[in-house]
């Protein structure tokens, strides 16, 4: 589960008058995040993969692999290079399967609806530049270890998402990219 996945609750989704209210969405998000008791089972929040989280785990496994290669004694506690490389391949494939579809290049979003401000809702899987950066960087790190060309190609294609799908706002002598294609 994720601290912000409360809007995936099947109970919440079954109540349209609640899910259409910006205030109710904020209350649910903050309630799930701050409640000392995990309400997710009771509220029927499914366990799902979060692409940004998988990207961070993939980066972590790449770091472990590099540490073991640099200091083979670490293999006793961290795993052999082969076992770590196998896990890197698994996580990279999972990450690739979690891409948001319909954009100019590889991109990733969160597996839940989330609200950035009181009146701005991002539907689940809306790609963001932040999640996409973590995921593309992790795939490049995986490529460095595995030499699986597809990992590099997919990672590099994220630049097409940034260049073609994100909005630009003029700022001083340049511009700023939006956080997502919706802004």
Which residues does each PLM region occupy?
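Glycan-recognition and catalytic cores of secretory/periplasmic carbohydrate-active enzymes
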Residues: 1-183
């Amino acid at each position: 589960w994720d601290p912000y996945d409360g809007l995936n609750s099947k109970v919440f989704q079954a109540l349209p008058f609640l899910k259409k209210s910006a205030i109710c969405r904020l209350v649910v998000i903050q309630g799930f995040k701050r409640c000392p008791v995990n309400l997710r089972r009771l509220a029927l929040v499914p366990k799902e993969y979060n692409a940004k989280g998988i990207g961070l785990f993939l980066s972590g496994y790449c770091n472990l692999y590099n540490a073991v290669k640099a200091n083979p004694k670490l293999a006793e506690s961290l795993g052999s290079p082969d076992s770590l490389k196998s896990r890197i391949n698994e996580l990279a494939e999972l990450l690739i399967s979690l891409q948001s579809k319909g954009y100019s290049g590889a991109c990733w979003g969160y597996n839940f609806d989330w609200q950035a401000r009181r009146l701005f809702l991002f539907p689940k899987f809306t790609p963001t530049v932040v999640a996409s950066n973590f995921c593309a960087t992790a795939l490049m790190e995986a490529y460095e270890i595995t030499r699986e060309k597809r990992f590099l190609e997919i990672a590099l294609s994220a630049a097409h998402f940034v260049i073609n799908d994100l909005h630009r706002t003029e700022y001083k002598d340049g511009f700023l990219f939006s956080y997502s294609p919706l802004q």
